[in-house]
């Protein structure tokens, strides 16, 4: 164990021992093949843990357990109030173990401990509690139909759901999906990302302690091309929920179409963040920069296309570069770290290749673009100037700490250019003019628009994308629709 992992609690030290098992049908079991894989510490590149690798046979076992729990188990007949109590109990256990969960997320993903302690983990707990409250509030309608009939609707659970979780917010994204599925009465097979599986396996221990019936929640770490594909292909899975790249989302959608599975997709983005001439620059500059650099830029809705009015362009770019240079980089467990490493060697190489492509196409790296440390997967916060709309770094999702500064002249022009993207996940704008804010927000093609803020979330507010940024919505009451079927019941009232 590296020195960085020695800073963790005793309880987490215990968890980090041995080879971690899959959680299937209420039991911790090795993979059927005995295959294992390692997950590294992004701050050092050293192996953090070894885990059993779920493959097709393990996926089949997990799906069958979930199918049995849904079709025959006590979960199906459990009252909504009882289901709610189990979810609240899990949230309470997460609260009790919040320090371990925060440290584990930082070790596995690399993100700063201040972010996991004050952001990821509290939000994950909030989501579980939010959806626990929904268990008793899912209702249908009585509909005044013609004739001597009584007609009503029921919202019934869709069944067994496969949930494929990304590596950028591992536990939080799991809660986005798991909370809504449990509230509606579905059973779950959850595949965490192979890069960051540990918080999901720690969660499995808490699920076990909470007393969920066997088979209701199954957690199977493995690789997308094997476990993920087997889960998407499985005929006994009724729905797939996926967060990740648009490229993989398209493949999942195609595979799910073979059996007409329900699908929700939260995919990529290349979000615009517009600074209007009247913006409060003391707030807008750090706000827009953090809208890109948060979580090392590994955020699907990162505001990586920053549009700046041409009259303020040079001044704002210089200030953004200075602010970027002030951000402290280091290992996530160091409390003064503001920017941690990228999640993996592959992601590190991907981001560096985009930076080089930006330079090759004529953009100017005002700051950053380098690797500040010899060890680990670090990239210095990078600000590009002289960026044009058709450059690769202005069109494609980089998923790293790279800001592209783009000049504009008029409001209608910048709206058109902001919308000129295959993505439509989110957008931001900074202005002191409320009328202007509503005018622009109405015209931006994005599932979320932030005004004078960025990356603000709440469990009650929906999140999802237009265009190739996805299908359906996560969070809020809207997410419940993803996990229910609507049944219309007609009763003849004639004698």
Swiss-Prot record:
Keywords associated with the record: NAD, Oxidoreductase
Cited SUPFAM superfamilies: ALDH-like
Record PROSITE patterns: ALDEHYDE_DEHYDR_GLU
E.C. designation(s): 1.2.1.3
Catalytic activity: an aldehyde + NAD(+) + H2O = a carboxylate + NADH + 2 H(+)
Gene3D superfamilies: Aldehyde Dehydrogenase, Chain A, domain 1 (3.40.605.10), Aldehyde Dehydrogenase, Chain A, domain 2 (3.40.309.10)
Enzyme's top EC category: oxidoreductase
Positions with a binding annotation for NAD(+): 244-249
InterPro entries linked to this entry: Ald_DH/histidinol_DH (IPR016161), Ald_DH_C (IPR016163), Ald_DH_CS_GLU (IPR029510), Ald_DH_N (IPR016162), Aldehyde_DH_dom (IPR015590), Aldehyde_DH_NAD(P) (IPR012394)
A GO MF term: aldehyde dehydrogenase (NAD+) activity
Active-site residue list: 266, 300
UniProt KW rRNA-binding keyword: no
Description of the deletion phenotype: No effect on vanillin degradation.
GO terms, biological process: aldehyde metabolic process
Entry similarity comment: Belongs to the aldehyde dehydrogenase family.
Record protein name field: Putative aldehyde dehydrogenase DhaS
Protein's organism: Bacillus subtilis (strain 168)
